[in-house]
Every structure is written in C-alpha cells, then in structure tokens.
Swiss-Prot record:
GO terms for molecular function: L-malate dehydrogenase (NAD+) activity. Belongs to the LDH/MDH superfamily. MDH type 2 family. This is Malate dehydrogenase. Its EC number is 1.1.1.37. GO terms for biological process: tricarboxylic acid cycle. The keyword Methyltransferase does not apply. Keywords: NAD, Oxidoreductase, Tricarboxylic acid cycle. Catalyzes the reversible oxidation of malate to oxaloacetate. NAD(+) binds at G11, A12, A13, G14, Q15, I16, G17. It comes from Streptomyces atratus. It catalyses: (S)-malate + NAD(+) = oxaloacetate + NADH + H(+). The gene is mdh.
C-alpha cells in the first residue's frame, strides 16, 4: 500500500527534478 509520506517524498523529488531539468534546459537555450 502507498503511504502519504511516500507520495509526499516522491512528489517533492518530482518537483525538484522538474525544476532542475527546466533550469538546465534554460541554460542550454541561453548558451
């Protein structure tokens, strides 16, 4: 069974990963 804590941690990791990916993509676009 999935626990709220596990979902929260996964969600936080997803947000951080998405933000990091977006920042890296912006860096490549800007050069």
């Amino acid at each position: 069974t999935r626990t709220p804590v596990n979902v929260t941690v996964t969600g936080a990791a997803g947000q951080i990963g998405y933000a990091l990916l977006f920042r890296i993509a912006s860096g490549h676009l800007l050069g």
